[in-house]
Amino acid sequence: MRTELNQGLIDFLKASPTPFHACASLAQRLESAGYQRLDEREPWPTQSGGRYYVTRNDSSLIAIQLGRRSPLEGGLRLVGAHTDSPCLRVKPQPELNRQGFWQLGVEVYGGALLAPWFDRDLSLAGRVTFRRAGRVESQLIDFKQPIAVIPNLAIHLNREANQGWAINAQNELPPILAQVAGDERGDFRALLAEQLQREHEINADVVLDFELCFYDTQSAALIGLNQDFIAGARLDNLLSCHAGLQALLAAGDRESCVLVCTDHEEIGSCSTCGADGPFLEQVLGRLLPDGDAFVRIMQQSLLVSADNAHGVHPNYADRHDANHGPKLNAGPVIKVNSNQRYATNSETAGFFRHLCFDVEVPVQSFVVRSDMGCGSTIGPITASRLGMRTVDIGLPTFAMHSIRELAGSHDLTHLVKVLTAFYSSPLLP
């Protein structure tokens, strides 16, 4: 099971260089399992026992199984994760010519660790909107091959490089695509039109706009003498999306189960398709009874907000509270914060711990040092919007928000096991 799950994650990461591609990958796997796509612009002919999924903005997805037992009797079991990761996104008018090199201006998306982006073989992927035969259409593209690089400055020209050199995102991050003659800047939209034709055999009249990000072409891999680790881009938080999907597909059909994978978590979730937008409320509002019955269902339901946790780093162990340093390959982590940066309370933490005990999965706790700030997740946002009990959990990770992150290769099995038990649990607290 461990080998199969890890290989499935590696394949999912490779197929999902952007939130758009992640959403498409999830949708494809759901359809293969018999889930029916619902269009938000059309009526929804749903029924008990039905399995459905909905997408918004091509980058967020909600899948729901309406169980044999009514949600009014047993509530909903929800797992939440996010599809986006910190990256470098191409600006609307990106063409640059500096010293005879064609470069693209980029904007930093989210709280990225910038230094690891240098000297990587980068490709480009995302969504392109274009006009064809008088109609406006959109299509996903992925160059797949390494087409760009951000070279470091030699240490001979920057003697302070190893003494905490600050990176200027405006000047030092534009990737190099090619050498050009004279003042030529290159035509980026023409390049995108060529890619549309090459990848999809689409002859666009004109490329109107795009949402594209660079990514590292190095594939995720199992590493270490004993393959104890999995290294790859976007583990935060596609690892949780993958685990949630595997658990949903493995769960029984008695209970009503929901998988929520939203975009824009890394920048605050405030969007039409983010956790702080109306997407989940509107989908549940159309699938469930309204009014008093809806509130009753919400109060019987539970959300597991799954987002990677900070594992205790052997070189920086002092960055953790001594009693709350999660270890890789030691099971999922319950995240606690008294200032509600995480939505966990004693009842929801206790229930998750109970599930772990039942399926013999090790479980850990994380509390940030009292003299450090704490990040947050979609957990508190969803809990406050729906009034739903929530537990924040995640798998321990090193190098979070780097271009290449590291997690334990045993932990994915632990997480899928306990999430499957959660989806199948006949009782909630």
Curated annotation (Swiss-Prot):
<feature type="binding site">
    <location>
        <position position="156"/>
    </location>
    <ligand>
        <name>Zn(2+)</name>
    </ligand>
</feature>
<keyword id="KW-0482">Metalloprotease</keyword>
<keyword id="KW-0378">Hydrolase</keyword>
<keyword id="KW-0479">Metal-binding</keyword>
<dbReference type="GO" id="GO:0006508">
    <property type="term" value="P:proteolysis"/>
</dbReference>
<dbReference type="InterPro" id="IPR022984">
    <property type="entry name" value="M18_aminopeptidase_2"/>
</dbReference>
<protein>
    <recommendedName>
        <fullName>Probable M18 family aminopeptidase 2</fullName>
        <ecNumber>3.4.11.-</ecNumber>
    </recommendedName>
</protein>
<keyword id="KW-0031">Aminopeptidase</keyword>
<dbReference type="GO" id="GO:0005737">
    <property type="term" value="C:cytoplasm"/>
</dbReference>
<comment type="similarity">
    <text>Belongs to the peptidase M18 family.</text>
</comment>
<dbReference type="Pfam" id="PF02127">
    <property type="entry name" value="Peptidase_M18"/>
</dbReference>
<dbReference type="GO" id="GO:0008237">
    <property type="term" value="F:metallopeptidase activity"/>
</dbReference>
<dbReference type="InterPro" id="IPR001948">
    <property type="entry name" value="Peptidase_M18"/>
</dbReference>
<feature type="binding site">
    <location>
        <position position="401"/>
    </location>
    <ligand>
        <name>Zn(2+)</name>
    </ligand>
</feature>
<dbReference type="InterPro" id="IPR023358">
    <property type="entry name" value="Peptidase_M18_dom2"/>
</dbReference>
<keyword id="KW-0645">Protease</keyword>
<keyword id="KW-0862">Zinc</keyword>
<dbReference type="GO" id="GO:0008270">
    <property type="term" value="F:zinc ion binding"/>
</dbReference>
<dbReference type="GO" id="GO:0004177">
    <property type="term" value="F:aminopeptidase activity"/>
</dbReference>
<feature type="binding site">
    <location>
        <position position="82"/>
    </location>
    <ligand>
        <name>Zn(2+)</name>
    </ligand>
</feature>
